[in-house]
């Protein structure tokens, strides 16, 4: 059991927001790949479970989330993507979640967000952070390879469909999602792209997305999809909501946002959704971790001046 104790040590280190060695990242990603490759594009998840939205590298707020929601493995978690970018601690955030996944594979489910992509992370911070913290892009490469193995969606008790963004005009059934070859960079268009990029909109049918990827989808589209797949609701993340969660279309779509005071300046609260074994819902609202518990670095860490 040397591997488990190694992993437990790494988890403790990461919980303290301390980096693990590049060689340890390589080994962790290799183990994660073995687990993730077995998961479905529509990963089955059993209740009770706590569902979480975007985290975006806000490590101390992820610790706050675990403080209010309970730790892994006591609490069963589903994270709906966007672990990295924009926050100061994308590396520690993603590696902690990945280490927990390897240690407790049945107690934490990670699905892919639009930021789990090589192209997006080169623009929004994760690439630069890996380079700064490890002195090379190797760790970024290991992590982005793992992104390709993450599930595209999850289904809780066959009734609640969870996806990062939303629906696609190319997809009417969950079986169609199951046939996608997900082990690739997020494409610029098509069903896999849409699942990670789309947003609900107070309209009917499909609309052009201002994001430049995915679509806007209306209440009629949701009603058809939910009926065709015998599901009660769609749970998704992807959009900042100031109250932490927001219902759409007569409670058939739910947005959950789990990064409080987003980008350290938006002033929003965050939420997680607790589902019991009967799928009864309980929202936990939380605020950003108190200032004194987080060493927020200056925008440009000191190391840069000496490199």
From Swiss-Prot:
Main location: cytoplasm
Requisite cofactors: Mn(2+)
Residues recorded as bearing Leucine methyl ester in the entry: 307
Gene Ontology CC: one annotated term: chromatin
Localization annotation: Cytoplasm; Nucleus; Cytoplasm, Cytoskeleton, Microtubule organizing center, Centrosome
Catalytic activity: O-phospho-L-seryl-[protein] + H2O = L-seryl-[protein] + phosphate; O-phospho-L-threonyl-[protein] + H2O = L-threonyl-[protein] + phosphate
Effect of residue 277 to K: Abolishes interaction with PPP4R4; no effect on interaction with PPP4R1 and PPP4R2
A Gene Ontology biological process term: double-strand break repair via homologous recombination
InterPro entries: Calcineurin-like_PHP_ApaH, Metallo-depent_PP-like, PPA2-like, Ser/Thr-sp_prot-phosphatase
Family according to the record: Belongs to the PPP phosphatase family. PP-4 (PP-X) subfamily.
Quaternary assembly: Serine/threonine-protein phosphatase 4 (PP4) occurs in different assemblies of the catalytic and one or more regulatory subunits. Component of the PP4 complexes PPP4C-PPP4R1, PPP4C-PPP4R2, PPP4C-PPP4R2-PPP4R3A, PPP4C-PPP4R2-PPP4R3B and PPP4C-PPP4R4. The PPP4C-PPP4R2 complex appears to be a tetramer composed of 2 molecules of PPP4C and 2 molecules of PPP4R2. Interacts with REL, NFKB1/p50 and RELA. Interacts with SMN1 and GEMIN4. Interacts with IRS4 (phosphorylated). Interacts with SMEK1/PPP4R3A; the interaction requires PP4R2. Interacts with HDAC3.
Protein name: Serine/threonine-protein phosphatase 4 catalytic subunit
Gene that produces this protein: PPP4C
